[in-house]
């Protein structure tokens, strides 16, 4: 498919693991980044060694994987499993929060049966506050680790929303949909 060709090109053009996630130490098991994007900016196909939770405090993004796309406004958060290739395009000025969870931290949350599935959840007030807590300097790292684990627990319990827009298999339609 066209996506496979894009992915093959991305893999050959990007160095190493093409993982841009900030590094974390295994003791904490998570890391985070906050980035502000202008409308129209994009991040080409890439993946991360960690699981990733994407959330926009402001703005809207379009996230694409090989088989689906998701429009993610501030009322939603998107879970991407470790090593899942994805790209995104910013549909408006967007303040993005990305939290990366190590495989070992994900494994500690034994109830997270959807950890290998891309899915969208509602960003409830609690989810938003937990995300904010991971970006706050008001909490020590051990407390933030507990916040990260609680966020994974909530991800495991939250019903996935059916927001995926399937990508067409026909090459011409796929090109038009991109």
Residues covered by each model-derived region:
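Short intrinsically disordered, low-complexity coil segments enriched in acidic
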Residues: 1-3, 79, 178
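A short, N-terminal "cap"/entry segment at the start of jelly-roll beta-barrel domains
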Residues: 1-28, 133-138
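Short, charged, solvent-exposed linker or helix-capping segments at domain edges/interfaces
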Residues: 4, 109-114, 162-163
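Short, surface-exposed, charge-dense and proline/glycine-enriched linear segments
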Residues: 19, 97-103, 128, 166-178
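N-terminal regulatory/effector-sensing and dimerization cores
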Residues: 20-119
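Short, solvent-exposed loop/helix junctions and linker helices
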Residues: 47, 121-124, 170
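Aromatic/histidine-rich interaction motifs
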Residues: 111-132, 138
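Short, Lys/Arg-enriched, Trp-marked, Pro/Gly-tolerant hinge/linker segments that flank
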Residues: 116-117, 136-178
């Amino acid at each position: 498919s066209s996506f496979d060709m894009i992915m093959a090109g991305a893999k050959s053009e990007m160095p190493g693991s093409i993982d841009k996630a900030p590094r974390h130490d295994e003791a904490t098991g998570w890391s985070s980044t906050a980035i502000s994007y202008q409308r129209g900016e994009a991040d080409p196909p890439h993946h991360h060694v960690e699981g990733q939770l994407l959330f926009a405090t402001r703005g809207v993004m379009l996230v694409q994987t090989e088989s689906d796309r998701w429009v993610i406004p501030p009322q939603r958060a998107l879970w991407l499993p470790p090593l899942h290739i994805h790209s995104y395009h910013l549909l408006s000025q967007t303040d993005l929060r990305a939290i990366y969870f190590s495989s070992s931290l994900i494994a500690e949350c034994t109830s997270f049966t959807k950890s290998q599935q891309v899915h969208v959840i509602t960003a409830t007030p609690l989810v938003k506050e937990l995300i904010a807590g991971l970006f706050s300097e008001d909490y020590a790292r051990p407390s933030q680790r507990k916040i990260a684990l609680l966020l994974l627990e909530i991800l495991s319990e939250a019903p996935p929303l059916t927001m995926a827009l399937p990508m067409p298999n026909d090459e011409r339609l796929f090109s038009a949909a991109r």
